[in-house]
Curated annotation (Swiss-Prot):
Cleaves peptides in various proteins in a process that requires ATP hydrolysis. Has a chymotrypsin-like activity. Plays a major role in the degradation of misfolded proteins. Its EC number is 3.4.21.92. Disulfide bonds: none annotated. It comes from the Eukaryota. Pfam families: CLP_protease. GO terms for biological process: protein quality control for misfolded or incompletely synthesized proteins. This is ATP-dependent Clp protease proteolytic subunit. It catalyses: Hydrolysis of proteins to small peptides in the presence of ATP and magnesium. alpha-casein is the usual test substrate. In the absence of ATP, only oligopeptides shorter than five residues are hydrolyzed (such as succinyl-Leu-Tyr-|-NHMec, and Leu-Tyr-Leu-|-Tyr-Trp, in which cleavage of the -Tyr-|-Leu- and -Tyr-|-Trp bonds also occurs). Its main location: plastid. PANTHER family: ATP-DEPENDENT CLP PROTEASE PROTEOLYTIC SUBUNIT, CHLOROPLASTIC ATP-DEPENDENT CLP PROTEASE PROTEOLYTIC SUBUNIT 1. It is found in: Plastid, Chloroplast stroma. Keywords: Chloroplast, Hydrolase, Plastid, Protease, Serine protease. The keyword Chloroplast applies. The lineage of its organism: Eukaryota, Viridiplantae, Streptophyta, Embryophyta, Tracheophyta. It comes from Gossypium barbadense (Sea Island cotton).
Length: 196
């Protein structure tokens, strides 16, 4: 039997009595955001809304995005990335578990010097994929062109965020490249590996 999302007490400033809120709402109030699933439009819109709201609420207090994601859709992921760059507060990114595909892209998108991986975290980068097998011939060609543009765009961001040469990033994106936390640090995707 599922227990649902745990509730925790929270006292609003100026109020005597605490109210019970789900743990995620409590953490959001502390500016702690979570991506713990595949990136899709729904989670993308939720995270974007939270980042914008929290930025408006206080534009000097940093945000923390915890990532444990197998990746997901490119466009919703890029929307999260763009929002991270747009909001005034610095966005720390923390990899716990796995940051693969779009998850690693978002991990690299944190404020430089504020990107962290837990010691046993795994990171994976690769090129964007498509559903070519579902497309008609004309659609296939248009989709291939769009996919190449997306790949170039993602590659440029990785080059900028990691400091690696274009040829290294391009070569790495040709296949699934898995990394430990320390390898991700050496690759420039994270700046720090958490220690006990």
């Amino acid at each position: 039997m599922p227990i649902g999302v745990p509730k925790v007490p929270f006292r609003n400033p100026g109020e005597e009595d605490a109210v019970w809120v789900d743990v995620y709402n409590r953490l959001y109030r502390e500016r702690l955001l979570f991506l713990g699933q595949e990136v899709d439009s729904e989670i993308s819109n939720q995270l974007i809304g939270l980042m914008v709201y929290l930025s408006i609420e206080n534009d000097t207090k940093d945000l923390y995005l915890f990532i444990n994601s197998p990746g997901g859709w490119v466009i919703p992921g890029v929307a999260i990335y763009d929002t991270m760059q747009f909001v005034q507060p610095d966005v720390h990114t923390i990899c716990m578990g796995l940051a693969a595909s779009m998850g690693s892209f978002l991990l690299a998108g944190g404020e430089i010097t504020k990107r962290l991986a837990f010691p046993h975290a795994r990171v994976m980068i690769h090129q964007p994929a498509s559903s070519f097998y579902e497309a008609q011939t004309g659609e296939f060609i248009l989709e291939a062109e769009e996919l190449l543009k997306l790949r170039e765009s993602l590659t440029r961001v990785y080059v900028q965020r990691t400091g690696k040469p274009l040829w290294v990033v391009s070569e790495d994106m040709e296949r699934n490249v898995f990394m430990s936390a320390t390898e991700a640090q050496a690759h420039g995707i994270v700046d720090l590996v958490a220690v006990k």
